[in-house]
Regions:
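Bacterial Sec-dependent N-terminal signal peptides
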Residues: 1-25
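Extended, subdomain-level signal for the structured scaffold at the beginning of enzyme domains
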Residues: 22-130
């Protein structure tokens, strides 16, 4: 139930971004903020951002002409939750993500959040992760 609610909220948020981008010519730039956290508490279990929760809104916005930058608290390569890369979690968006060399290169060198100027962006989006 939580997952359905989360995706419903995510879809509504993305829809608002899209509607605003279509209706407001100046809305063209969104900052995606993903985690730098790579371990789940003191369990030693690897974690990071969830690929589908990043990829679905990323491509929805990108395909509407929105420019997207990516930042993390520490800058650099954000960790991906290994469970999100399981074949059972694959979707069209995650397959596109895996094949997107331009995006994968961008993710290797994300901006450090402290260095981001908020006035450069029309919106900020936080994909899921720990």
């Amino acid at each position: 139930m939580k997952k359905i609610a989360f995706f419903g909220i995510m879809a509504l948020t993305v829809s608002c971004f899209i509607a605003a981008a279509q209706n407001k010519k100046s809305m063209k730039k969104v900052l995606f903020v993903v985690t730098s956290h790579d371990k789940l508490g003191n369990t030693g279990e690897k974690t990071g951002f969830w690929t589908e929760e990043f990829a679905a809104p990323y491509y929805e916005l990108l395909d509407k002409g929105v420019t997207i930058d990516v930042a993390t608290p520490l800058g650099g390569q954000p960790p991906i939750d290994p469970k999100s890369e399981d074949p059972s979690a694959a979707t069209e968006d995650t397959k596109r993500f895996d094949a997107d060399t331009e995006l994968l290169a961008k993710l290797k060198n994300t901006k450090k959040l402290a260095d981001v100027k908020e006035s450069d962006y029309d919106a900020v989006f936080y994909p899921g992760g720990h």
